[in-house]
Every structure is written in structure tokens, then in C-alpha cells.
Amino acid sequence: MFFDGGSDIARYDEVKWPQIEKITNRQLGFFWRPEEVDILKDAADFEALTDQEQHIFTSNLKRQIVLDSVQGRCPNIAFLPLCSLPEVETWIETWSFFETIHSRSYTHIIRNVYANPGEVFDNIMNIKPIVECGNDISKYYDDLMAVSYTHLTLPTTPY
């Protein structure tokens, strides 16, 4: 799966791990676009919430945006350079793609319930607990990327 040299062409007629191929195909079957979901009622429901409930709702979306931003990028950046099987590459790319769909769905919700979505987005990275939550996850990717960068760039010896 990993560290066996890069994969060349994407062949799906011969896969080493059919379970990975099955997971990818199943995941692709769940594809959807946020705009396909009617959320017109959400704005009215949001307005009916108390200020405290609106705060909880919005804070949850902010946290999810940060987490899905990390998960939408980091698996590709961290794992793909190490990957050696096309079916695993495709699964990783599919996983990251779905995380970006999640993030886009939160944007879709925020656009629908806030007159000025910038009010929500502009301060996300100023909320310490949310930033720390993102850092708690991204540190593992950062560590892997640092080690793999060193591994991938070290000169090799013929013996």
C-alpha cells in the first residue's frame, strides 16, 4: 500500500486490495452536492432559535469547517506521496473529496441562514478552541509529512 515506490498507471482490472476498491465504490455511491438539499426551512428554523442555540449551532458549523478543511487537504498531501497502489490512491482522493463536500455543505447552510456569511467565516481562525482542535488533528499529518519528506529526499546508497 505504501512505501513501495510510486504507482504508475491507474489499473482497476487488477487490484491488490479488492476491499479498498469496494470501499471506494461504495463511497462514490454516496455522492451528493450540498445545493441538491433544500434548506429553505433552515433559515426559519434558525431564526426561531434562542441566541444561545444560534451560538451553539454556528459554533458547531465553525468547528466542522475547520476540521473538514484539514481533512479535505491533508490526506492527499500526507499519504499520496507515500502511496504505491492505484486503488489506495483513489480511495484517499475520494475520501478527501468527500471532506470538501462536507465543508461546502456548511458554507451552503451558512449562506442560507446568515445575511452576511462573512460574519461567520471571518473570525473562525480567531477562536482559540476551534484553532486548537484543528491543530490537534493536523499535527499528526504534519509529523507524517516531515518524516516522509525526509525519507523521500534522502540520498540512497547502492548498498
Predicted regions and their residues:
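Single conserved hydrophobic/aromatic residue that forms the stacking wall/gate
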Residues: H151-Y159
